[in-house]
A protein has these predicted regions:
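N-terminal subdomain of nucleotide-sugar transferases
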Residues: 1-57, 178, 255-257
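Conserved donor-binding/catalytic core segment of Leloir-type glycosyltransferases
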Residues: 225-243
Length: 462
């Protein structure tokens, strides 16, 4: 056995963060490999990136499957994968998604001499608000089989009280030969939240998301139009309660008018409606919305903007440390474009060597950073700005309160429409039921039965 196998539930051309990171590792390592993955036909595809990855893929095992994180889907990927793969001296798997680690575990148990590298992108058990990311593992047959192996090794046993993702972390920590984390805080959080005792001190490494060679930034030229009379800022990605983009909005609102007029914001996101509620009217007028784009076009486009914005997730009160290192950072580094990192205090991103860094919920610091960026880009002398933070926060709160009120009005209006539609549906359903009842009464009536022979005669003369 000499060949290496990549086990990745999502893999190029399927367009996900995980499949792109796996593709980047393959392109950086430049070694021939085999791959086993799921088809995931309903997820967007990126065939341009696949063309470059295929240079190193000798054999690809494709398991027909729709995307699902349910146990039946995981089990299917595991069972079907085991029918296809054999003869590998080294395997590599990456989660998210846990399907990959479960299949890798199965192969390792059946081939103990195989070296297994297992990478974790993020903590798998909990997310914000202590919310579980998966359901309970209720497959008693699987639990019983694994527990026999764990008992032989003197390990704690799993049960139907454990989450699927929890079992994935625990078993991977035990049986993998090498554990890969993207950063130290991620490791600390995962070990802290795991309800089992396991020591991985001798087999873990840190490996941040890879940055591709410069040639890949020129592989797919983008024809996206930029007006060089302005300073063009770009943000790629989504927003959610713990990554809100609020700090950029607040900074923009408190810089000088001449700098505001020079800014153009370009958003590549599926969250247009959310951004439209968040942005102020002035900033919204200076913003261009775009859908997500293919990965290689994104790399090329990242070289064309003046500033790339990346923001930490706000994790205080949710984790002992911030375990997340935005994957965009590795791509931005290769672009040679100015990066503005809006960080959480003491996060992994805050420790990186980035010229422009500011911090979440630090209004004066964010304003000062944006002011510095604009002065540098316009070749102007930096001027000090005076901010009445309390007054601004009142204004911003009023603005957001009004937006919330507008959204409530929209929701109530849509709800009333739904009520009207439901009433109409109920009315039509009642009419149909009455017609069916009348029809049934006619068919069962004596007059209908008596005239049966006459109807037959009538058909003959037609």
């Amino acid at each position: 056995m000499t060949k290496k196998l990549i086990i990745s539930y999502a893999f190029s051309p399927t367009n996900t963060t995980t499949s792109n990171v796996v593709a980047k590792r393959i392109l950086n390592e430049k070694n021939k490999i085999d791959v086993v993955c799921a088809s995931l036909d309903e997820i967007n595809k990126d065939f341009t990136l696949e063309t470059y990855v295929n240079e190193y893929v000798e054999k690809k095992y494709m398991i027909p499957s729709n995307f699902s994180t349910e146990w039946d889907n995981i089990l299917n990927f595991m069972n079907e994968g085991m029918k296809l793969i054999k003869g590998y001296s080294e395997i590599y798997s990456r989660a998210n998604f846990v399907h990959s680690h479960f299949l890798a575990l199965e192969y390792k148990l059946n081939n103990p001499e195989t070296y297994w590298k297992a990478e974790f992108s993020d903590p798998l058990i909990y997310t914000f608000g202590n919310r579980h990311l998966s359901g309970k593992l209720t497959d008693e047959e699987y639990i019983s089989r694994i527990n026999k192996i764990l008992k032989e090794k003197g390990r704690e046993l799993i049960s139907s009280e454990n989450d699927i993702n929890c079992v994935c972390e625990y078993l991977t920590f035990i049986f993998a030969d090498e554990i890969i984390f993207t950063n130290e805080s991620q490791k600390d959080v995962m070990m802290d939240s795991l309800p089992f005792k396991v020591n991985i001190d001798e087999k873990y490494i840190f490996s941040p998301h890879p940055t591709l060679d410069e040639k890949y930034y020129q592989a797919k030229k983008s024809n996206y139009a930029l007006d060089k009379n302005y300073i063009n800022f770009a943000y790629f990605g989504v927003i959610f309660p713990n990554r809100s983009f609020e700090d950029f909005v607040n900074a923009f609102e408190n810089i000088s008018d001449k700098h505001k007029d020079k800014i153009r914001l370009h958003l590549f996101t599926p969250n247009r409606t959310l951004f439209e509620q968040l942005l102020t009217r002035d900033l919204l007028e200076k913003t261009t919305f775009n859908q997500n784009i293919d990965y290689l076009e994104f790399l090329n486009l990242s070289t064309k903007f003046d500033v790339l914005i990346v923001e930490d997730s706000y994790t205080k009160g949710h984790f002992i440390k911030n375990p997340y290192l935005p994957s965009k950072i590795s791509d931005y580094k290769g672009s040679n474009t100015t990066i503005w990192a809006i960080c959480e205090e003491n996060s992994e991103m805050s420790k990186l060597d980035i010229k422009y860094k500011s911090y979440i919920n630090d209004l004066s610091g964010n304003v000062d950073t944006l002011n510095s960026i604009m002065c540098e880009k316009t070749n102007e002398q930096k001027e000090s700005l005076t901010i009445d933070e309390n007054e601004y926060q009142k204004q911003r709160t009023t603005h957001l309160t009004q937006k919330i009120a507008e959204l409530i009005d929209v929701c109530e209006s849509e709800f009333k429409k739904d009520e009207m539609y439901l009433a109409k549906i109920n009315e039509l359903t009642s009419t149909i039921e009455n017609l069916e009842k009348e029809n049934s009464e006619i068919l069962n009536s004596n007059s209908w039965k008596i005239t049966k022979n006459f109807r037959k005669i009538g058909k003959k003369f037609k």
